[in-house]
Amino acid sequence: CPFEVIDTMYKDAFTKFEPEYILPFLKNVASSYINNDVRLSDGRIGKVVLINENALSLPIVQCEDEFIDLSKTRGLTVSAIL
């Protein structure tokens, strides 16, 4: 899943990459998934509605009428882009 790659690269941003280049790159990659349907790790299907600038791999996802901030929901992640 692309959000797992974003998470891995973000963790290495200050040790293996130049932060002034990798952080804007990761932000743009994450933002490209806004309005994409995703499957969450609990099986629910939702749509990425907003990228969290402090946790690029944990966007805000809309599942039906509920908005889920993955950065505040422990253990819940995007498992697949649909």
Segments from the language model and where they lie:
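Terminal helices and disordered tails flanking the catalytic cores of nucleotide-processing hydrolases
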Residues: C1-L82
